[in-house]
Amino acid sequence: MTTHSMSRREFARLFAMGGSAAILSHQTLLGSKPVRMTDPITSAGTVDWKTIRSQFLMPPELTVLNAANLCPSPAPVLETVYNYTKRLDSKPLPSFRAEMREVKEKTRQQLAKYLRVTPEEILITRNTSESNNWVSNGLDLRAGDEVVIFSDNHPSNNEAWKERGKRFGFTVNEVLPLNPHPGFDYYLEAFKKALTPRTRVLSFTHLSNTVGDLFPAKELCGMARKRGIITLIDGAQSLGLLDVDLSDIQPDFYSGSAHKWPCGPKETGVLFVNKSLQERFWPSIYSAYKGREGLAQTHEGLGQRDTPAIHAFGQQIEFLRKIGQEKIEERSGDIATEIIEELQKTKGVYIFTSNERALRSAVVTFRPANLEPAKVVKALEEDGIVATNLGGDDWAGVRFSPHFYNSNSDVERAVGAIRRYLRKGL
């Protein structure tokens, strides 16, 4: 395997750092990285992707292709978490805690603007898993009711419905995936056939975390709405990657996390709850320090929160808006296209992800001939390339999920490594 200037021990140390870890070794962690968001737009109106990449702590010799699992945060996000935590711990005055509650409301407004909805419809959660569970726990479902799910949803979505079905007696029916992506019409028809007069909820992923299949969210929500069926979109793989306009898609619920594609602080997330459904949605937790806007007044009582992280989440959302979410979606999709095109030239590689741009985005999963995916991912890590392996019978393979901070050279390094392993072995 190739040797890089960064040792494996150093790589492991850097990779393990994240979020509030900045507090532990502040100067070492930030180094010479900027502590204010640098304007990524040039005088010509184009995006300077190199400037954006420079704001992340990742060393040049590290290629991170794992956005579908965990994205690094830029240095200014870590600086915000550090500064506000230090201030709170230095002088934990009641006035400052009140100020931090105002900061949470500002983040709510930023999220609402980003998703094109109202602040009254935004709940700030800890991640997609919590958001999904709030939904499955907060709806009145009983014996005889049915919930339709996509079987390739994340476990935090599917398992929650199944376990509550056992408890309350409702039935959970699944729509199975088909590979390669059969097209939007196929899935619209498959979900339509699964709906019955007893169906109360339709829960599906916006973009699958396995092979990166994109789903016709607006059309599925419209179909369900005509039948009086509640919709939950798991947006863990679309928030921060796709240009999500919930005012256009019109779901009843939409969940997402900051730690993936938004590149935000860890353990912050969002749940959108459509105004039309709020009276039918019960809180899952009752405690203090609720929000001030809309549904947050009753549903966001989680007690003490990591308010510095919530503040940093809002700042990162503003940074994404400054770049332009449509440009981020295009950039990430272009890099994924390049990965697919290069893998197609590689003998022995089978690509699970659709080659058709309209049916996917930036999640690329492939089988590297007869090599064991877990061993391939381990070899990639030793070569300074971060990826994920998927298990199971259906999608056993390696997953590359590039983001806007990646470049063509990252594609060359990653695909070059795969070709080398196939040629020489692991």
Language-model segments: residues:
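Pyridoxal 5′-phosphate
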Residues: 2, 7-426
